[in-house]
Amino acid sequence: MQALLFLMALLLPSRAGAEEIIGGVESEPHSRPYMAYVNTFSKKGYVAICGGFLIAPQFVMTAAHCSGRRMTVTLGAHNVRKRECTQQKIKVEKYILPPNYNVSSKFNDIVLLKLKKQANLTSAVDVVPLPGPSDFAKPGTMCWAAGWGRTGVKKSISHTLREVELKIVGEKACKIFRHYKDSLQICVGSSTKVASVYMGDSGGPLLCAGVAHGIVSSGRGNAKPPAIFTRISPHVPWINRVIKGE
């Protein structure tokens, strides 16, 4: 498959499909135990699919544009079409948006999902470390993204988790987008490679040296890189306050 494709709109109904990793490979089953498969149900019964990742036993992080009135999270999954014994399906009690989330610009496209109960941490379900508030993922860094999104613009979603290696590039490459701010976002994906994220991958993590530095946020309609990821480090103080219940 090519690279990770982004979920570009707000929420896509399941009948429309959701996109996945482009230019990547199928992940080794349960090798990324922090990954979460997020389902958001609309008032009309449509289901939007996003990625997410476990940052504390009772909290999953995903993109703000993936949030909705009724949500469930599946942890410990590799093939989401199967009932794997490792899976834990938990309803979302509530979602917490940052005070400065901007719907139109997608700045601060991050949300915390508080689960109705704590996840049972196992070899297939575990938390991922976050960066420090001053940690700044820099251009040239090689990172990994993963998700269940489409493998191509005209292809269906993937039932198994896929991953792709992506390079952080300079902010100049993301000037093609109407809204981009390097202090809040990360520009990811080289134009010389057929690798990126797309619909259905939204909300998934960007891991650099084992640390979650970004969240799949938005990209181009043709699925060509670069793509925009929300930068996590500026939100770490807020994240810590939410987890502590402050």
Swiss-Prot record:
Prosegment residue ranges: 19-20
Domain of life: Eukaryota
Pfam family, one: Trypsin
A single MF term (Gene Ontology): serine-type endopeptidase activity
Entry annotation: catalytic residues: 65, 109, 202
Tissue: Selectively expressed in uterine mast cells.
All copies of domain Peptidase S1, residue ranges: 21-244
CDD domains tied to this protein: Tryp_SPc (cd00190)
Listed InterPro entries: Peptidase_S1_PA, Peptidase_S1_PA_chymotrypsin, Peptidase_S1A, Trypsin_dom, TRYPSIN_HIS, TRYPSIN_SER
EC number: 3.4.21.-
Signal peptide: 1-18
Cysteine pairs bridged by disulfides in the record: 50-66, 143-208, 174-187
UniProt-listed SUPFAM superfamilies: Trypsin-like serine proteases
One of the GO biological process terms: proteolysis
Record key words, sorted: Disulfide bond, Hydrolase, Protease, Serine protease, Signal, Zymogen
Protein family: Belongs to the peptidase S1 family. Granzyme subfamily.
Name of the protein in its database record: Mast cell protease 9
Gene: Mcpt9
